[in-house]
């Protein structure tokens, strides 16, 4: 018969890799087509004019210009791209 208790296995020791979510371009920043504006899980922010949404809900620029965040009724936040000539007015 064994006189030494067997060592228990740890139930910790796991950790997931970081996903680097969040806003990548803030309001007023200049973007070119294809730039990622927001990486998110679900539709925290919605695409507006000049912004597309990927299958993982990533928002990206479809055209160049300045980023603008608009708060609409219902609590939705829309991300728009304003062209540079319009932004100067």
Curated annotation (Swiss-Prot):
Keywords for the protein's UniProt record, in alphabetical order: Ribonucleoprotein, Ribosomal protein
Region (Disordered), start-end ranges: 1-21
Family: Belongs to the bacterial ribosomal protein bL27 family.
GO annotation, biological process: translation
Pfam family, one: Ribosomal_L27
Species annotation: Hyphomonas neptunium (strain ATCC 15444)
PANTHER family for this protein: LARGE RIBOSOMAL SUBUNIT PROTEIN BL27M (PTHR15893:SF0), RIBOSOMAL PROTEIN L27 (PTHR15893)
Gene, per the UniProt record: rpmA
HAMAP family registered for this protein in UniProt: Ribosomal_bL27 (MF_00539)
GO CC terms: cytosolic large ribosomal subunit
Molecular-function GO term, any one: structural constituent of ribosome
Protein name stated in the entry: Large ribosomal subunit protein bL27
NCBIfam families xrefs: L27
């Amino acid at each position: 018969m064994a006189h030494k208790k067997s060592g228990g296995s740890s139930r910790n020791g796991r950790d997931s890799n970081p996903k680097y979510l969040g806003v990548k371009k803030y309001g007023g920043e200049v973007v070119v087509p294809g730039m990622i504006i927001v990486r998110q899980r679900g539709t925290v922010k919605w695409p507006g004019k000049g912004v597309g949404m990927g299958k993982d809900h990533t928002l990206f620029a479809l055209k160049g210009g300045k980023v603008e965040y608009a708060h609409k009724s219902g609590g939705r936040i829309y991300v728009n791209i304003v062209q540079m000539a319009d932004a100067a007015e």
